[in-house]
């Protein structure tokens, strides 16, 4: 049984030191382009850890898509989905994103990135069915959202304060 969708504004826990994983290279599965989190400095970044086998991740991806549509696809909101299942590869991730119509950045998290997420924030970031997400604000501060599925409205409530700053 899937956990209920969170309808309350998610609580946010912030960290201010720039994490090392922001400098680690990722490869966008859809474009084959290399990027780092630091490439998005000055923008608001919504990061989700996921896996292609995870049904909650499909739901969460659909809600991220609705979020972008509701906000008019702003240039200063970037979404990144990091596949933390080391058994999955770039080709299968590309197929997954295409199949579901997800058009933001998808990357297989290298082991060092996955370890950093688990060590810095919590091992739950390596458990995709918990729908772990975080927001990186314009100043590079990391804000962790509560675990559990979040609908587009809840995500909008979480990101809008950072978009208006």
Feature locations, PLM:
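Short active-site neighborhood of thiol/selenol oxidoreductases, capturing the structured segment around
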Residues: 35-58
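Structural microenvironment flanking redox-active thiols in thiol-disulfide oxidoreductases
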Residues: 58-101, 112-119
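Rossmann-like NAD(H)/NADP(H) cofactor-binding core
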Residues: 47, 78-82, 107
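Alpha/beta-hydrolase fold active-site loops
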Residues: 44-45, 77, 131
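Non-globular targeting/processing and membrane-anchoring segments
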Residues: 1-2, 6-7, 163-165
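Thiol/disulfide oxidoreductase modules built on the thioredoxin-like
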Residues: 100-102, 111-160
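N-terminal "domain-start" segment that seeds a small globular fold
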Residues: 4-37
């Amino acid at each position: 049984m899937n956990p209920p969708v969170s309808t309350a504004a998610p609580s946010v826990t912030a960290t201010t030191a720039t994490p090392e994983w922001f400098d680690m290279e990722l490869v966008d599965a859809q474009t084959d382009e290399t990027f780092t989190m630091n490439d998005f400095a000055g923008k608001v970044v919504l990061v989700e850890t996921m896996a292609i086998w995870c049904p909650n991740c499909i739901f969460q991806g659909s809600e991220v898509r609705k979020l972008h549509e509701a906000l008019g696809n702003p240039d200063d909101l970037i979404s990144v989905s990091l596949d933390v299942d080391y058994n999955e590869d770039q080709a299968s991730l590309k197929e997954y994103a295409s199949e579901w119509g997800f058009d933001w950045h998808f990357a297989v998290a290298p082991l060092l990135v996955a370890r950093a997420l688990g060590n810095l924030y919590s091992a739950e970031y390596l458990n995709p069915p918990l729908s772990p997400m975080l927001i990186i604000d314009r100043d590079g501060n990391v804000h962790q959202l509560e675990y559990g599925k979040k609908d587009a409205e809840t995500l909008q409530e979480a990101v809008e304060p950072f978009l208006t700053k």
